[in-house]
């Protein structure tokens, strides 16, 4: 999935236009801090949108429907999750995820909700948003050995971490991420590839600066990310373009898939002149649209 667009649940205009954004995944955002009355209305709007587009998505396969909920240290995350699950989303993005225990707790609640709603067990995926606070950033590495099977991707929170550490900038000279943020970002990419799941880049929020946005997306792809979050439909085309596979990448993916098809039980194979692990097989299948 190349483009993931984040849609504020309280923004009626944005929700109405979401289906036409062209993004591969539409994420209805229920994690934004709002007044209680607005929060309740946002949940209703999110639930209604997810329900309304459920059959359309199943029939046409145009986009996936996701919801972003507040962290499990908030008082209203269960209400947000309940509203989202009424529409049977493809998955949940967990904001301010503190680590593996948060993921396990969310997975356990999802199992109960799926059973109550008559959904297939474990059908709802999870993408944790990591590194919002210093202590959370330091715990990211543990996910390499303790990742729940529901987790299909990882993303991160540059702005949240920058605020938490009192950083005065997100990027340094040349547009490079400042060192603490780059550390978190690198862990997200490495763990995602180690586990054969998606690595999703933090959004570029200056909607008016398309040229810089394109460069940011191209850099993210060059650094190993598989997709990126958009905050406006205008960003979707250049995200999709930046993350489109090259002919050489498609050719290599075909060779990897063919090699493992011929020897499906092998833990690794030599393809061309290099050793290929099974985690690369998963990535090759995703690249070819087989996953």
Where are these regions (language model features)?
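Expand to "…catalyze enediolate/carbanion chemistry for C-C bond making/breaking, isomerization
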Residues: 1-291
């Amino acid at each position: 999935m190349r483009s993931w667009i984040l849609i504020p649940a309280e923004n009626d205009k944005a929700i109405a236009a979401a289906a036409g954004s062209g993004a591969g995944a539409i994420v209805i955002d229920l994690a934004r801090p709002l007044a209680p009355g607005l929060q309740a209305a946002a949940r209703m709007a999110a639930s209604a949108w997810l329900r309304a587009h459920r059959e359309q998505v199943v029939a046409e396969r145009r986009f996936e429907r996701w919801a972003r909920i507040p962290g499990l240290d908030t008082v209203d995350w269960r209400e947000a999750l309940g509203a989202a699950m009424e529409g049977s989303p493809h998955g949940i993005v967990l904001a301010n995820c503190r680590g593996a225990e948060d993921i396990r707790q969310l997975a356990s609640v999802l199992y109960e909700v799926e059973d109550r709603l008559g959904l297939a067990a474990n059908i709802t995926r999870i993408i944790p948003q990591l590194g919002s606070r210093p202590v959370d950033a330091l715990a990211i590495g543990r996910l390499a050995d303790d990742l729940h099977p529901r987790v299909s991707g990882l993303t991160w929170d540059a702005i949240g971490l920058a605020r938490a550490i009192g950083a005065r900038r997100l990027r340094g000279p040349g547009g490079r991420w400042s060192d603490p943020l780059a550390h978190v970002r690198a862990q997200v990419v490495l763990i995602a590839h180690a586990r054969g799941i998606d690595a999703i880049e933090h959004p570029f929020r200056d909607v008016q600066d398309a040229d810089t946005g394109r460069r940011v997306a191209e850099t993210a792809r060059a650094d190993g990310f598989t997709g990126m979050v958009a905050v406006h439909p205008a960003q979707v085309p250049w995200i999709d373009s930046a993350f489109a596979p090259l002919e050489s990448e498609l050719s290599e993916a075909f060779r990897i898939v063919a090699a493992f098809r011929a020897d499906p039980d092998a833990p690794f194979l030599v393809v061309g002149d290099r050793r290929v692990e099974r985690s690369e097989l998963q990535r090759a299948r995703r690249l070819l649209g087989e996953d």
